[in-house]
């Protein structure tokens, strides 16, 4: 239940539950698990007895450190012969543990992360700072709205609206030579990267119900963001020809050196890592992952000419492939390293072009085609990013699973020899 609340993948939840069942001496064939988005159902039964437990999960929040610690705890409990009380005590410690970063530190880092997006989209360093300010205000606004009990999706819409209004106001300041780029980047902290990647992971692993629910949750979050942005654009009368042309004229081709994009990608990746509560010791690893992802994407896209969709897939694929080995170096789950690293590849320019095209429709021939072309391209890029992360991890699990099962069997045999094993 704790893993579902911190948005772990369904496959990992199932593996950990089976490992804990083995620690308790429950044979796998007598354990029946059904995982849903808001409900976890477990049944243990034999020919004479049947025990069922339903556990509800209402609040969902990303916590990468907790994901890592829960996984390690299930192994440690077997190795060190934990009593049930000791295991429960350790689990409660993980649940009560303070996050690595205070709310205001996370808000500041999120601001810099979206500033990194702005730089990746071609903005200057003043636009970077403007984006960081707008994002900081929007991020804290969303947090306050949720604290006051406002609906999550409405909180997202309010924060997106406020971010867009602030970025629009800054466009008149004359401080930046790229005044419209902050509008593209200031709300991208809302894009639900973790649910999206877990959705692809679940669908490939045949956890269809949870996968579809995650997809619906992702659509609702993006819908809330789009509503807030669209309302701001209408309220601020930003449907005029000049603004529309400015967004359509924004170049998708990099104009800066690769090292500039590497710095921006590292900042964005580390910023999102603080949102996901990644351990401090891993921030530099995530930064390197972000650099590899963005530079690979740009090389495949522009140097080899395969386009942004294939480029984004290859960027996330390479990072995920490296992470398959790196998880053994840093002793953390794959997603702790991969998800923050690939977030800087989110296609903000295409998303905005699609949204603006839909808002500014006046019945002219070709408007629908333009809107859907940008929308489909941005959706394909996001899907390929998620697919690139999921595929190497899924195939690696097939090979690692046998070794892991062999190791688990050996540990259980040693525990039985010590007289600590509970026979069912």
Predicted regions and their residues:
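Short juxtamembrane and helix-loop transition motifs at transmembrane-helix boundaries
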Residues: 85-98, 112-123, 139-150, 239-253, ...
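Alpha-helical membrane-inserting segments
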Residues: 116-117, 121, 137-145, 162, ...
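Membrane-interface helix termini and inter-helical loops of multi-pass transporters
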Residues: 173-179, 237-253, 358-373
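Structural signature of hydrophobic alpha-helical transmembrane segments
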Residues: 118-134, 179-192, 247-264, 305-317, ...
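Short, small-residue-biased leader/transition segments that mark boundaries at the very start
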Residues: 2-5
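Divalent-cation
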Residues: 10-35
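C-terminal transmembrane helix-loop-helix hairpin of multi-pass membrane proteins
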Residues: 182-186, 198-202, 206-223, 256-258, ...
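Core alpha-helical transmembrane segments of integral membrane proteins
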Residues: 99-198, 275-276, 280-285
């Amino acid at each position: 239940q704790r893993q579902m609340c911190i948005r772990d993948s369904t496959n990992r939840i199932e593996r950990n539950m089976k490992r804990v069942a083995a620690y308790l001496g429950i044979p796998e064939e007598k354990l029946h698990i059904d995982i849903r988005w808001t409900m976890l159902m477990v049944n243990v039964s034999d020919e004479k007895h049947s025990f069922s437990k339903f556990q509800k999960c209402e609040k969902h929040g990303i916590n990468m450190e907790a994901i890592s610690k829960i996984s390690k705890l299930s192994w440690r409990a077997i190795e060190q012969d934990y009593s049930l009380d000791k295991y429960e005590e350790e689990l409660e410690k993980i649940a009560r543990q303070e996050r690595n970063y205070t709310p205001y530190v996370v808000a500041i880092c999120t601001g810099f992360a979206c500033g990194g997006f702005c730089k990746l989209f071609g903005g200057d360093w003043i636009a970077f700072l403007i984006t960081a300010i707008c994002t900081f205000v929007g991020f804290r606004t969303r947090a306050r709205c949720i604290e006051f009990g406002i609906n999550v999706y409405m909180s997202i819409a309010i924060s997106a609206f406020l971010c867009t209004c602030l970025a629009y106001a800054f466009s008149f300041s004359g401080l930046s030579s790229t005044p419209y780029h902050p509008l593209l980047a200031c709300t991208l902290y809302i894009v639900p990267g973790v649910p999206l990647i877990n959705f692809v992971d679940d669908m490939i692993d045949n956890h269809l119900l949870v996968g579809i629910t995650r997809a619906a949750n992702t659509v609702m979050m993006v819908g809330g963001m789009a509503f807030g942005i669209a309302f701001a654009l209408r309220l601020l009368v930003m449907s005029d020809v000049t603004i529309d042309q400015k967004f359509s004229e924004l170049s998708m081709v990099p104009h800066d050196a690769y090292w500039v994009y590497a710095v921006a990608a590292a900042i964005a990746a580390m910023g999102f890592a603080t949102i996901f509560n990644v351990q401090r010791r891993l921030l530099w690893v995530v930064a390197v992952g972000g650099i590899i992802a963005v530079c690979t994407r740009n090389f495949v896209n522009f140097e080899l000419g395969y386009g942004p969709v294939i480029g984004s897939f290859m960027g996330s694929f390479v990072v995920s492939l490296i992470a398959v080995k790196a998880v053994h170096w840093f002793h953390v789950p794959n997603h702790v390293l991969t998800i923050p690293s690939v977030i800087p590849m989110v296609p903000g320019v295409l998303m905005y072009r699609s949204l603006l095209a839909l808002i500014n429709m006046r019945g002219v021939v070709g408007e629908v085609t333009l809107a859907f072309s940008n929308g489909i391209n941005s959706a394909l890029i996001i899907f390929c990013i998620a697919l690139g992360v999921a595929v190497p991890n899924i195939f690696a699990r097939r090979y690692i699973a046998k070794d892991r099962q062999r190791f688990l069997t050996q540990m259980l045999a040693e525990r039985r020899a010590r007289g600590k094993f509970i026979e069912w």
